[in-house]
Amino acid sequence: VLLFSLISLYFSFKYLEKLKLKYLFINFFIFFLALLAKENTITFLAIIPLSAYFFSNYKARNILISIIPLILASVVFLIIRQSIIGTTPEKLEDELMNNPFLGMNFTEKFTTIFYTLVVYLRLMIFPHPLTIDYYPYHIPLVKLTDLRGIFSFLIYLGLSVFIIRNFKKKSIFVYSLLLFIITLSIASNILFPIGVFMNERFIFISSLGFSLAFIYFLIEIMPKIIKNKKVYQATFLSMMMIVFLLYSVKTISRNRAWESSFKLFTN
């Protein structure tokens, strides 16, 4: 999914650079393949023009033209999906395993959703503990008066203010945040229920935004903080080694859980 989405982003920029129709036709098929791989790709309808805005000075008209094949590919995909799958039976929404928010009122539902969005941020920084299944109430019900809910709202309110205030500056951190939020939005339960509170795999594409912000901080921001070149290089290498070692240990330890179906569902 991510591979095809990034290839589509590449061909969008190729069109904007060359203004040749062949890139629009190629992009239609690439984006359609990405949608067939996973429908989360549809969030790149926003990411691609956003990327053009942040990293180029192309005309708005040409940017809009560049996403026409993406829109057409999305329409074709949705028509095919609807004809094969149809709509979800309403009775599924009355089953806890398909609707983890069953029995919650409006404020409880959205406070819990914002809490899960903060959990996603935490997992980006500190991916422990991990699980294959966030079954109903694995994530606790969070009420509006719960400090966890208040804290979650304040975090995303602060991020929203930061995005609004720095959007015109084309800040890399703003782009990274938007990449994280937009690609996660389709699996956030805000737009529509997806049947689970959350899942770690839902932030695979979103992790691109986190990685971009982290690397930008190390390469562009940290040298301005640490003026001494040798100290900066030592700090940079130390931080990269820490990340490499800790994440490698976590990856290897999680691999053991995937040895068999039995181990997977008992870990």
Where are these regions (language model features)?
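Polytopic membrane enzymes that build or remodel cell-surface glycoconjugates and lipids
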Residues: V1-N267
